[in-house]
Structures are given as C-alpha cells and as structure tokens.
Amino acid sequence: FRCALPISLGRTDEPPILLRAHDTDCKMVMDAALPLYKNLYTMHKYNGESLTTYEPRGPWSKIHSDLSALGSIHISNVHILANLEPWRWGSPDFVQKAVNAMHNVHGANALHLYPQASYWDWPYTADKLPDGKREYQLDRDWIWYKTWGRYAWNCHRDRSSEVEYWDKQLGDFYGTTPAEAGDILEAYEQSGEIAPKLLRRFGITEGNRQTLLLGM
C-alpha cells in the first residue's frame, strides 16, 4: 500500500487519499494506514443529507469529533441537501455560524461543498426560463457559493462588517438602494431559518428519505 499507489502513478510523493465516513470504517483504516501513509483525509456529512442547524450536537457530531482526532485533516461535507430542494436558499449568518461549528464543534478544517439544489442536473437548475434556455446553477444560486466560499476562507469575520458587505453585494446584484438591500438581506436571513427549523421539528429519519420531505 505504501509504495504501490505512487509508483503506479509515476510519482515519488504520496497523493492524497480521502476516506468518506458513510462508506468506510475510518478509524480502522487510519489506525492501519497512517503509520505507512501520511497524506490521508477523513470526511463526513455536516448535518447528513439536509441542513438543519449551526449548533450541531449528539451522536452525529461525535462521529465528526472522533474523526478529527484520528491524526489527519477532517473535512466537513455539505452534501445533497434534501430539505432545501428545489428552492433558492441563502443566509450569510447561518453559513458563517455553520462554518464556525465545523471548526469548533466538529474539529473540521476543510469544506467539501455540493450544489444547493439540482445536483444531478449540474451545471443547470430545474428552473425554466422564458426563452426556453436552461439556467446555470452558478447564476441562480450565486449567494450559496459566495457565502460558503467566503466563510470557508475566513469564518472569523466581524458580523456588523459582514452586514455591510452583504448589503453591498445584494444592492449591486439587484440594483437597489442600500436600505432596500438591507431589507433583502433580512429576508434572506429570516427565510434561511425556515427549512432547517421545520426539519428539526417534524423530520423523521436522516437523509433524502425524510418523512417531512416525502410528504411535500
């Protein structure tokens, strides 16, 4: 194992290998492999296959903290989020708090981000445009990628300064006054809590099989 993979690729270094917790016994693999191969990473889904909270706790969080203690970099995976489909979603405050939780509660130091919706249709959304063309996810869900990218890079940003930043971003995007942009940001922040709170109250089972979602 130590030599075969790099040699077969014609490399003298150790290429990165990622262990995904939902299909691998990471502890068993890490205990056996780390003494031989150092460039290993672990990854686990942040809230599962839904976005439910920026205050994670319980058995799911323990999986993260256990993985982050194994001796390599742990990656938080924002997976296919069934409870956000098919709507548009963007809450800078929620995302900043979630990334802080990834660091402080789960011990993660990297992010693997999936599209906000329509993963299997990438790069297109499910939206129908008037001219019949398909809309790109990077255009429709720009705030999704911008928030996660911004706070994955640095989640320790002053909140009041962030409000000013997002007011400017939204004002430029929608062509509004600063006051109107502030109202749009507030709408994003308030609506961003709805799907996570509903699932925390009524969801049964984890993943894209949730009773709440199957009934919608």
Where are these regions (language model features)?
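C-terminal functional modules
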Residues: 167-174, 179-216
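Catalytic-core regions of glycoside hydrolase
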Residues: 1-178, 185
